[in-house]
Design a protein with these regions (language model features):
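Residues embedded in well-ordered beta-strands within globular domains across many folds
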Residues: 6, 146, 220, 295-296
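Radical SAM [4Fe-4S] cluster-binding motif and immediate context
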Residues: 13-260, 282
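Flexible glycine/acidic-rich beta-alpha junction loops that bind and position SAM and/or redox cofactors
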Residues: 72, 105-112, 155-158, 229-234, ...
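Residue-level recognition of beta-strand->loop/alpha-helix junctions
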Residues: 81, 222, 265-267, 299
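C-terminal, active-site-flanking charged/polar segments
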Residues: 243-247, 282-288, 300-305, 318
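Catalytic cores of alpha/beta
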Residues: 271-285
Length: 326
């Protein structure tokens, strides 16, 4: 479930700018002195952005979060379970679910960490996101906005409207000069967020064109693996929401529209075979040659609170977690 969260951002912003938490301990009648700071010459070897005229650092990238958590339940991740587990009792946390009698694997939804979500995903509206963009543009004049939500929008009809409305606001802002036309936007998105599900599964080309017009440049896609079987194993747990065919449709579609998508790959998935390992390496290499960026991590690292971590901790899987410093 996704719910829009209406927060009076204008009031909050003005509060932080005019007073802020740092000012709460100050008496109202104390006159604040302006502190002059001498700035020396910039280090020519420093790679931080420096304004050559004022010797002051300037902001190139703004990082924003617009939602409470990710609705997906990937087996290695705890984003979806944080609110659930923070409200769970010790008895609920330690409960051992009953194994299926037919010899099948325990369904992930039977776990405390992956059960029904007591909290919907809250996100701020396109208008509120746009307002935050404008305020940061006015104050910092950045070059890039990075939306750091695990899933910036969801691939449902309301989710598509959410991102399309934001794109329209950004496009209009660039046309009127309210936003610098060269500003870029980056975000993380799931493969399924680019796919129209009904009546037939197809690439949402209209959305991709709208994203490009608005200035979206880079998408980090949580592919994890190109091996079809591994998409539904417990440590990955895509639960049949996406297929390898979907992955190829979206990645190739983004390439065809002039994007260079970033594909996140976990190289050593615990349940995989040698054949699947080589297959994933082969497909990833082919996409690299086409211009796709491959963000590859060698090991699957389960977060505490994730489904696979709970299975391991409760002895419900033959998999073991071995932690090392590297």
């Amino acid at each position: 479930e996704i719910k829009d969260l209406h927060i009076p951002y204008k009031d909050y912003w003005e509060y932080t700018q005019n007073e802020g938490a740092a000012a709460l301990n100050l008496e109202k009648n104390i006159k604040k002195e302006k502190i002059e700071v001498e700035l020396g010459e910039a280090d020519p070897h420093c790679d931080l952005p420096v304004n050559k005229d004022t010797q002051k650092f300037f902001v190139e990238t703004i990082r924003l979060y617009t939602s409470s958590h990710c609705p997906w339940k990937c087996g290695f991740c705890s984003s979806h379970s944080f609110l659930r587990m923070s409200n769970a009792t010790a008895e609920q946390e330690e409960k051992i679910p009953e194994m299926p009698k037919n010899g099948e694997k325990l369904p992930m939804n039977a776990l405390t960490s992956c059960g029904s979500q007591p909290h919907p995903v809250y996100r701020i509206s396109p208008e509120q996101i746009y307002d935050i963009i404008l305020r940061h543009c006015d104050k910092y004049d950045p070059k890039v906005f990075l939306f750091n939500d695990d899933a910036f929008w969801d691939g449902s009809t309301p989710g598509f409207k959410h991102i399309m409305d934001l794109c329209n606001l950004i496009i209009e802002g660039k046309k009127t000069g309210r936003i610098n036309k060269d500003i870029l936007f980056n975000c993380q998105a799931k493969v399924g967020d680019f796919i129209i599900k009904k009546p037939t599964r197809q690439l949402h080309s209209e959305l991709i064109k709208k994203l490009k017009e608005a200035g979206f440049y880079h998408f980090g896609t949580g592919v994890e693996t190109f091996a079809e079987r591994l998409l539904t194993v417990q440590s990955i747990n895509k639960k049949g929401n996406v297929s390898e065919k979907d992955q190829h449709m979206v990645i190739q579609g983004l390439l065809d529209h002039g994007f260079s998508p970033s594909v996140n790959i976990i190289l050593f998935v615990p349940e995989q075979t040698i054949e699947e390992l080589f297959y994933v390496m082969k497909v990833a290499t082919e996409y690299m040659l086409k211009g796709t960026q491959i963000a590859m991590t060698p090991l699957l690292r389960p977060q505490e609170g994730s489904g696979i971590y709970e299975l391991i901790r409760k002895g419900l899987t033959p998999l073991k977690a071995h932690y090392v410093e590297w």
